[in-house]
Amino acid sequence: MCGECYAYLTCIWCKKGLDKVDAKRCHEKKIRIACRNGKHCAVCTSCLENGLYLERSLFPGRPIYPGDLYEPDPWVMFNDIRCMYCGGCLTRDEKERHRLFCEDFWIFRHQVRGRCYLCTRHGSRPPYKETPAAV
């Protein structure tokens, strides 16, 4: 199975053991394993999405232009950019979609974020609108 290295880990926040679905998602999203107090940890899906929600709501984002219609900025294609909603790594095509639809990337806490196809389709998760940080 492709998530075996994550199968026996616990979530870094809620301390629950990862089930097979969360282990596979960690593998697909290339989540790095962290070591806390001598234990290896990853993150479950609900904690990851809650953490990303807090990041979007507590820290105001800064827009980053992905490049003009004819030429993408070189850093966009070579750097890892994660989805601001689900935490997955954006593919080359997903980065291109940002450029072609003139949708900005956003920086939260020095990390560039965008939206993946799954979080874009059917309007389930709308583009980020800059709002003041919650007090």
Swiss-Prot record:
InterPro entries reported in the protein's UniProt record: E6, E6_sf
Alphabetical list of SUPFAM superfamilies matching this protein: E6 C-terminal domain-like
Keywords: Activator, DNA-binding, Early protein, Host cytoplasm, Host nucleus, Host-virus interaction, Inhibition of host innate immune response by virus, Metal-binding, Modulation of host cell apoptosis by virus, Transcription, Transcription regulation, Viral immunoevasion, Zinc, Zinc-finger
GO biological process: DNA-templated transcription; regulation of DNA-templated transcription; symbiont-mediated perturbation of host apoptosis; symbiont-mediated perturbation of host ubiquitin-like protein modification; symbiont-mediated suppression of host innate immune response; symbiont-mediated suppression of host type I interferon-mediated signaling pathway
GO molecular function annotations of the record: DNA binding; zinc ion binding
Subcellular location per the Swiss-Prot or TrEMBL entry: Host cytoplasm; Host nucleus
Principal location: host cell
Keyword DNA-binding among record annotations: yes
GO CC terms in record: host cell cytoplasm; host cell nucleus
Stretches annotated zinc finger (unnamed): 11-47, 83-119
Domain of life where this protein originates: Viruses
Role, per record: Plays a major role in the induction and maintenance of cellular transformation. E6 associates with host UBE3A/E6-AP ubiquitin-protein ligase and modulates its activity. Protects host keratinocytes from apoptosis by mediating the degradation of host BAK1. May also inhibit host immune response.
Annotated HAMAP family: HPV_E6
Self-association state and partner proteins as the record states: Forms homodimers. Interacts with ubiquitin-protein ligase UBE3A/E6-AP; this interaction stimulates UBE3A ubiquitin activity. Interacts with host BAK1.
Family statement drawn from the similarity comment of this UniProt entry: Belongs to the papillomaviridae E6 protein family.
This protein's name: Protein E6
Source organism of the structure: European elk papillomavirus
Gene of this entry: E6
